[in-house]
Amino acid sequence: FNVGFGYDWMSSKYTKNQLNLFELKYNKLISTTPDFDKMMDENPSIALSFEDQFIAKAGYTFTFDRVFGRRRFEDKRLTVQASITEGGNLFSGIWSLAGADGTKRLFGTPFSQFIKGTLQAVYSHRVVGQHRLVGRVFVGAAHAYGNSSEIPYTEQFYVGGANSLRAFAVRSIGPGSYHSEKENSSGYYDQTGTF
C-alpha cells in the first residue's frame, strides 16, 4: 500500500513548490505460485522490485518553469526541478526514544533510512512548426545510513528505457551498467546506482 500527505503551491507565476510531509510505502509479498518463483529466480532485477520494503519518507521539490518568446507557440521553454527526500528518520527517532538497538523493524520488515537529492533541467527550442530541439540534464545522488546498508531499490537511479534514453534498454547504460566480455555470460549484475 501507499499513502501520503503533502501540499502543492505556486510561489510565483513561474515557480511551484511541493512539500511532501509524509509518504508511507509498504510492499510485502504474501503468497506466490511456483511459476512466479521460477520467474523471480530467472530474473533477479524483477525479484529485487518484489522484496519486502517499508519506506517512510518526506521531501521537498522546487520547480521553475518558464516559456520564453511567443507563449502560444512555446518557442523556448526552460524547466528546472530540484528535490530533496529523506527516508526513515521519523521512525528511527521513535525507536531511539524507545531505546531500541540493532535493526529496527515495523510489521516485521526493516524500514529504510536514506537521503536523496536530484536536479533536472530541460530546455526546449522550437525549430520549425511542431519540431523541437530538446536537451535534458539529470543528476542525482542518494546515501543510505542508520537502519539501511543500501537505499531501497525503488529509490535507486538507472538509465535507459522509455523515460530516459529510448535507444537503450532500461538499465543497460549509466550507473552500475556492466557489459560482460563473454557473449553468453551466466552472471547477473544489477544495474542501478546511488548516483
What are these regions (language model features)?
Residues 1:
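A surface-exposed, charged beta-strand/loop segment in the N-terminal or early-internal portion
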Residues 4, 14-195:
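C-terminal outer-membrane beta-barrel translocator/porin domains of Gram-negative envelope proteins
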